Amino acid sequence: MSYYDDDHEMFRSSLRGWLAMNVVPNIDQWEADGIVPRQLFADAGSQGFLGMAIAEEFGGGGIDDFRFNHIWAEELAYAAAGGSGAGFPLHVDVLVPYFTEFCNDEQKARWLPGIASGELITAVAMTEPGTGSDLA
């Protein structure tokens, strides 16, 4: 029994092709440079890969189905691109839900379109002075 339907498999096929063309050939250079070009996020956003769970009114796919996030993880692993430093899982899995669940409508209108399009790249900054995790 598959947990994925035809829509998931179409997403997988598109994402796999996009990763093969846009990420895999560049991984070594990005690792050496220690940076991924901002344009990569814009390219991913233009393909609809960054905002599946973001409401359509804010530029997303309007599909609240975590299986798409799981496909992201599978395809990054398949492409051996999980360590590319691009931060797609952080953007898609961790931070989008903060914005979709905890922002008011004005904040959603301000931030979600850019997050879905890749114009804005999300990040997390944490500190636990003197205790806790060493996030470095």
Predicted regions and their residues:
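Amphipathic, non-membrane alpha-helical segments in soluble helical-bundle scaffolds
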Residues: 5, 12, 34-38
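Glycine-rich flavin
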Residues: 22-136
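A non-catalytic, amphipathic alpha-helix used as a structural packing/dimerization or gating element
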Residues: 7-21
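Intrinsic disorder at enzyme termini
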Residues: 1-7
